Curated annotation (Swiss-Prot):
Molecular function as annotated in GO: ATP binding; metal ion binding; NAD binding; NAD+ kinase activity
GO BP term, example: NAD metabolic process
InterPro entries: ATP-NAD_kinase_N, ATP-NAD_kinase_PpnK-typ_C, NAD/diacylglycerol_kinase_sf, NADK
Coiled-coil intervals: none
Binding residue positions for NAD(+): 49-50, 54, 118-119, 148, 156, 159-164, 183
Enzyme Commission number(s) from the entry: 2.7.1.23
Entry protein name: NAD kinase
UniProt-listed PANTHER family: NAD KINASE
Cofactor(s) required, per the database record: a divalent metal cation
Record's keyword annotation contains Nucleotide-binding: yes
Organism: Xylella fastidiosa (strain Temecula1 / ATCC 700964)
């Protein structure tokens, strides 16, 4: 389905600090003009996937669709950089994403909330393995996971850290989440689970003083956590725009056949 957009949409250009992205931003503003985020019809993010995630975290609540152009090292969430921007915006296909909503409790009693568009990951902070229990919708499913940690990934993020940890690639729009252990020692044969998107996931660190654990929501890290609750956000949703010949759904599908 193509995105309905005015013939000359107002574009706010955002760029990473990398020199190629900054240079491209100046060239695009000279050609198409520039406006504030508040006045824009669409945001154009110039950089790599890391910058796209930062853009979504900073401006996702604006409700403006985001069209990314790859000027970084990794560009799974980006389109290729070309000159015919207006034509491509007219033909762009939307992908609507809901982030994960995370609540973390630390040893000191502090509560920290964050969103994650790719994944939430718990990881041991020292050489010692983490001990983590896993509750789903209030029911304990794993009393004690021993290993490096555990990942909860969205479909859009399932091809990233989750896939590197041998987790499943999830189809876009499948309304599922991937729950994937990182280097599990016990239970040794458990390779994770595919969950309904509305599942509430509670991860408890069983020996936080001797075996400390950190949690990272995309790039936001909180150290020394004792409990983390994760669920799909019911309030926030973002729209990414992709060229129809290489949309996000096709990219996720193609990753399953990459060698």
């Amino acid at each position: 389905m193509e995105m309905m957009m005015t013939a000359a949409p107002r574009i706010a250009f955002l760029a990473s600090t990398a020199e190629p992205a900054q240079r491209a931003r100046q060239e695009l503003m000279a050609r198409y003009g520039d406006c504030s985020i508040e006045e824009a019809d669409v945001l154009c993010a110039l950089g790599g996937d890391g910058f796209m995630l930062r853009t979504l975290h900073r401006h996702g609540a604006s409700g403006k669709p985001v069209y990314g152009m790859k000027l970084g090292s990794v560009g799974f969430l980006m389109n290729q950089y070309h000159d015919d921007l207006l034509e491509r915006l007219q033909r762009a296909e939307p992908a609507k994403l809901r982030p994960l909503q995370m609540m973390a409790q630390t040893e000191s009693g502090v509560s920290v909330e964050s969103l994650a568009y790719n994944e939430v990951s718990l990881l041991r902070q020292t050489h010692q393995a983490a001990y983590i229990s896993i509750d789903l919708n209030g029911q304990t499913r794993i009393d004690e996971l021993t290993g490096d940690g555990v990942i909860v990934a969205t479909p859009a993020g399932s091809t990233a850290y989750n896939y590197s940890a041998h987790g499943p690639i999830l189809p876009l729009g499948s309304h599922t989440l991937a729950l994937t252990p990182i280097a599990p020692y016990r239970p040794r044969r458990w390779r994770g689970a595919i969950l309904k998107a509305d599942t509430e996931i509670r991860l408890r660190v069983l020996d936080p003083y001797k075996r400390p654990v950190s949690v990272t929501a995309d790039s936001h890290e909180i150290r020394d956590v004792v409990e983390v609750t994760i669920r799909e956000s019911t309030e926030q949703r973002v729209t990414l725009l992709f060229d129809p010949e290489h949309n996000l759904e096709e990219r996720i599908f193609s990753e399953q056949f990459a060698f």
